[in-house]
Every structure is written in structure tokens, then in C-alpha cells.
């Protein structure tokens, strides 16, 4: 059994799907039922005793500083590429923290701490089987391996949630692959998920 020791929360993007609200506030800081989305994540991580928390910031980054005061275990990592690159750049700037890590998007609402359980068998994503049509990413798997991913959605597949866990070894491999794609191949318009999946 593997155990997550740290979390990387991706929060550098513009949140275009929530315009005009995100003109003045980053999407992860939008409050739902009186609490920001990202704080539901932080609190669930803390309840799971995951206390090494990194938030990758970019757009309106100064607004995240209050989180480091409220939660001293939170560290901010600035993504200087967020305006010109896809989210591969956010994981690239956090690549030193990928071993035994959980990676998740900051614009999720976590009410059940068990969703962020630190215990896991092998590296991979949180998914749920769906028979119904979804526009979310849909994975096909054989055993413990992802064999394909439809970004346009579909039905009868594993709907991807943006929560993944990585062993020490797989975290090292992911770091190497991120460096290869971002530095050498200069693939800067891809999703970070493209690196381990494709």
C-alpha cells in the first residue's frame, strides 16, 4: 500500500468557463455555501493528514496569499508561463514535489474527505464508471492501465476526475517526462495529463 505525503493543487488558470465572475477572482477562490472551492480541498487534505500542500498560482496570484496565512502548511508556487502555456506548465514548475504526491485541480468542491484518501495501491486517477453520456474526459482501461482517453466524452466508460496519486517511482518518471516534453520537445500547449496517458 502506498501513501500520499504531499499535494499539488493546480490553480494558475483563468477559469474562462466562469466568466464574468473570474474577471476579479480566481475560480478556485469562488465561494460555494460560504467556503471557497480550494479551501474545501485544503480542509479535506488536512483531515487526511496530508500537510505538505503546494498551490500552483498564476492568474490573480496575489489573491491566494491569504491562504498561506490561514493555512501555514500551504506553499505557493508561481507559474510564470500560465499566460502562454497550457497546464503542463503548472505541473512543470511543481515537478520537484511529484514523488508520493496527489495532483488535483483547485476548482473542485470536496465535501467527503474520503475522496482524497492518502492510501492507494498504484499510480492513477480517480474515476467513476458511467453508463450515461458525459462531456467530461472518458477513459478506457484494461486492468490497471489506461488504454485510451476521449476528451470529447461519451458513454459507458470511466469518467475522469482531476485527482491523481503517484508513487515515488512514478513521480520520478513523471518529472523526467515533464522535463522532456516542456524543455526539450517544447510541448507547451498540451495538458499535463497528456504526459502520462499518451
Predicted regions located by residue number:
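Catalytic core and acceptor-binding pocket of nucleotide-sugar-dependent glycosyltransferases
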Residues: 183-198
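Short catalytic helix/loop segments, enriched in acidic residues and glycine
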Residues: 24-39
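A conserved acidic beta->alpha catalytic loop
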Residues: 60-62
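Conserved core of the sugar-phosphate nucleotidyltransferase
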Residues: 112-186
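A short, N-terminal amphipathic alpha-helix
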Residues: 35-52, 93
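N-terminal nucleotide-binding beta1-loop-alpha1 segment
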Residues: 1-23
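Conserved beta-loop-beta/alpha segment of the NTase-like Rossmann-fold superfamily
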Residues: 65-137, 141
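Short acidic/polar active-site loop segments enriched in Thr and Asp
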Residues: 5, 51, 99
Amino acid at each position: 500500500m502506498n501513501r500520499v505525503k504531499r499535494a499539488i493543487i493546480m490553480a494558475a488558470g483563468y477559469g474562462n468557463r466562469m466568466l464574468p465572475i473570474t474577471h476579479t477572482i480566481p475560480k478556485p477562490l469562488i465561494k460555494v455555501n460560504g467556503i471557497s472551492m480550494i479551501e474545501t480541498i485544503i480542509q479535506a487534505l488536512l483531515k487526511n493528514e496530508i500537510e505538505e500542500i503546494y498551490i500552483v498560482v498564476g492568474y490573480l496570484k496575489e489573491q491566494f496569499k491569504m491562504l498561506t496565512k490561514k493555512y501555514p502548511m500551504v506553499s505557493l508556487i508561481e507559474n510564470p508561463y500560465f499566460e502562454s502555456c497550457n497546464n503542463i506548465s503548472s505541473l512543470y514548475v511543481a515537478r520537484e514535489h511529484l514523488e508520493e504526491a496527489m495532483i488535483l485541480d483547485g476548482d473542485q468542491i470536496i465535501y467527503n474527505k474520503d475522496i482524497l484518501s492518502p492510501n492507494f495501491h498504484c499510480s492513477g486517477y480517480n474515476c467513476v464508471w458511467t453508463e450515461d453520456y458525459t462531456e467530461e474526459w472518458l477513459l478506457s482501461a484494461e486492468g490497471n492501465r489506461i488504454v485510451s482517453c476521449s476528451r470529447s466524452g461519451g458513454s459507458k466508460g470511466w469518467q475522469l476526475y482531476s485527482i491523481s496519486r503517484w508513487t515515488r517511482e512514478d513521480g520520478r518518471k513523471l518529472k523526467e517526462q515533464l522535463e522532456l516534453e516542456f524543455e526539450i520537445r517544447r510541448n507547451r500547449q498540451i495538458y499535463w495529463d497528456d504526459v502520462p496517458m499518451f
